[in-house]
Amino acid sequence: MASPGAGRAPPELPERNCGYREVEYWDQRYQGAADSAPYDWFGDFSSFRALLEPELRPEDRILVLGCGNSALSYELFLGGFPNVTSVDYSSVVVAAMQARHAHVPQLRWETMDVRKLDFPSASFDVVLEKGTLDALLAGERDPWTVSSEGVHTVDQVLSEVSRVLVPGGRFISMTSAAPHFRTRHYAQAYYGWSLRHATYGSGFHFHLYLMHKGGKLSVAQLALGAQILSPPRPPTSPCFLQDSDHEDFLSAIQL
């Protein structure tokens, strides 16, 4: 896959990559989203379905973080997983998705900040995110040394994911970030989960991380997690990313 999106050409981009973290950008981007084609980061459902479906049961309560105008929630419904709640902090896109899928009342759409979820603890069996963490980290300049702000932001999200998952629940994260960059974020013992990694896609490979609530991290994973505030020296001089004029940069940002 040549680009991170599927379904249509990328819309207008923010002036700087850090704009991907701002709700104002997304509100503007999603004007008219109810009538536009879906846009999926890092592949559509068919590209990772074989990895995802073994982790899902028809009765699962599924939460999709940062849904945007992706087709994922609707495709889960069509695939036999009807209990899907999707959240995004852009009220514009939430309203658009409610309008687009008004014929499917089982699907729920809510405006919410993924760093502070308004759900009771242990209320979901599965939490999915695809590209949401990547967007929150898009302003980082050096993939080897994530800022303390970036580390804290990701920790806020992951802590909330762990909180809303039931014992035995699954968190599935799809991203462009390779294990040597992303594992250290997920591999914190206090989240209370195990961690596995797989790749998907043809040509350019994306990464799928599977966490089981109640499992344990390996010694090697815990060692990586311990590096989050004191990362190892990179093998070459740090690459300071320049703002890109297209959204392929998210496939290379590797945070």
From Swiss-Prot:
Residues recorded with modification Phosphotyrosine: Y39
Effect caused by changing K130A: Abolishes protein-lysine N-methyltransferase activity
InterPro entries for this protein: Lys/N-term_MeTrsfase_sf, Methyltransf_11, SAM-dependent_MTases_sf
GO terms (BP aspect): methylation
Positions with a binding annotation for S-adenosyl-L-methionine: W26, Y30, W41, G66, D88, Y89, D113, V114, K130
Top-level class of the enzyme under EC nomenclature: transferase
Recorded superkingdom: Eukaryota
CDD domains linked to this entry: AdoMet_MTases
UniProtKB keywords: Methyltransferase, Phosphoprotein, S-adenosyl-L-methionine, Transferase
Annotated phenotype, changing T132A: Reduces protein-lysine N-methyltransferase activity
A Pfam family it matches: Methyltransf_11
Positions of short motif Required for methyltransferase activity: 129-134
The enzyme's E.C. designation: 2.1.1.-
Keyword Repeat attached: no
Presence of keyword Transferase: yes
Molecular function per GO: methyltransferase activity; protein-lysine N-methyltransferase activity
Family: Belongs to the methyltransferase superfamily.
Function: Protein-lysine methyltransferase that efficiently catalyzes three successive methylations on 'Lys-36' in eukaryotic translation elongation factor 1 alpha (EEF1A1 or EEF1A2).
Protein name in UniProt: EEF1A lysine methyltransferase 4
Native species: Homo sapiens
